[in-house]
């Protein structure tokens, strides 16, 4: 019963559950005198105006959802910053919506910098005591809303990100450093709002949903600002020598001082409206209705993708699965087969010296397949790992899937060599003609990654 079709359909249910347009639409309600956004109420007057500012992988669809609910008479301006590869999905956005693109392959570029300057200019132009700035924020926002602090330039910031990613930095570590190299991240965007108020509807792509780190927290005033000791600890934990960093970056981080930020008043509100948990619940509901004993194990899976892949292989080959590393602290009780184990979160990849092409989900599944070369499955299984944004690393694949039927073919390609070369994409492209790739195209959102493991008795 552990079938690929069930797993693929369950992943599709994940994507439907976190569809940004409907999520934003459900978060906003309007009557003649009252605007309700998430859990916050605004009394409307004849002078009330709303400026919608959306940035991130879900920005276009989130903007559509907001405009579905808001009267045109209230809307002063809508400005959207979307990933370059999403050009063409902006249909149904009205002509008065300004859409800017940037951050191809999820890295900041000069287009991102230009778009950020445009956002700052619009905030300054429309700021008034009767203005509500509605921010729609999603994963990828860090790359799209970019304004390096002087004297840094974009190339220096990019080099810093590259170094950190090569050392396996988590999104939390990356965004903490980004905040300290930026004029808009870490609540600094709010410095531009002198009179109006802001509310942010946020789709989380960070484990644990820390609102101050999602998209590097441009609309969130930190409860405690980082000091240079926190920054040093991050670099030391990643084994990054400061001498590896560009000189200007090193100087900015070493001379870090507390920022002058607005007081954290009721003028600035932030609400998380979607996360990895929403996707996992949808998959669990579908699989339960399909006859599986379904369990959400965690939405906080982290660590090295290749090592996690080996741990999934351990579950597959253990008769008593609850003794495996990934499950031993889960309080999981297995009563009846078939079972569905669901995981969510975000892992990292340590790149080889001359890396090929790949992503953490493809690497995790490849590592699992490679580990099964020397171990015998104790169950019929199907295992999928895929990113909800549809883009695993700088590739056109969301992830990969394997099951028992793939094991006899495992010797046809040298999976270990592809792993060592950080070249998981090309392995899956060649393996069975690409049949094991998960190809969804860009989903228009991002709530991190999903792992689904179906197990049945042999």
From Swiss-Prot:
Coiled-coil residue spans: none
Pfam families: DUF4147, MOFRL
GO molecular function: glycerate kinase activity
Gene Ontology cellular-component annotations: cytoplasm
PANTHER family reported for this sequence: GLYCERATE KINASE (PTHR12227:SF0)
Family stated for the protein in its record: Belongs to the glycerate kinase type-2 family.
Protein's UniProt name: Uncharacterized protein C13B9.2
